[in-house]
C-alpha cells in the first residue's frame, strides 16, 4: 500500500532527540490528523508543539508515541487521526485504527479474537493441555 501522506508538520522548537535516525535502517511512523484551528498540544516525547489549522502530519519513532499523541488529540475533540508505518523502502502501511474503528469502541462487524464462549470455571486443566499439542486458546 504505497499511500502518499499529506499535511503540514506542527511547529515546535526542538529536535526528536535522534529518535528518527533508526528510520534509515528500520522504520518510522507517521500520524495524520485534521484540526479545526491552530492550537498547542503536548508531544509524547516531551515538550509542546503548535498544530496547524487543517491537515497535520508528524513523523515519530515509535507506534506507542502515536497512540499517546492520539490520546492528547482526543482532549481537543480530534478523533480523525490515523497512524502509518513507513519502511525505509518508502512502503506505507495503515496500522491504526486497523478496521476504521478505535479498539475501545463497539463495532458490530468486528470479529472476536481468541474468544472462547465459556466461563473461567469451565477452562480445561492446564496439565491436560500442556502436552496435548494444542494451543491454550484452542483447548
Curated annotation (Swiss-Prot):
SUPFAM superfamilies: Photosystem I subunit PsaD. It is found in: Cellular thylakoid membrane. It is a peripheral membrane protein. Its main location: membrane. Pfam families: PsaD. PsaD can form complexes with ferredoxin and ferredoxin-oxidoreductase in photosystem I (PS I) reaction center. PANTHER family: PHOTOSYSTEM I REACTION CENTER SUBUNIT II, CHLOROPLASTIC, PHOTOSYSTEM I REACTION CENTER SUBUNIT II-1, CHLOROPLASTIC-RELATED. This is Photosystem I reaction center subunit II. The gene is psaD.
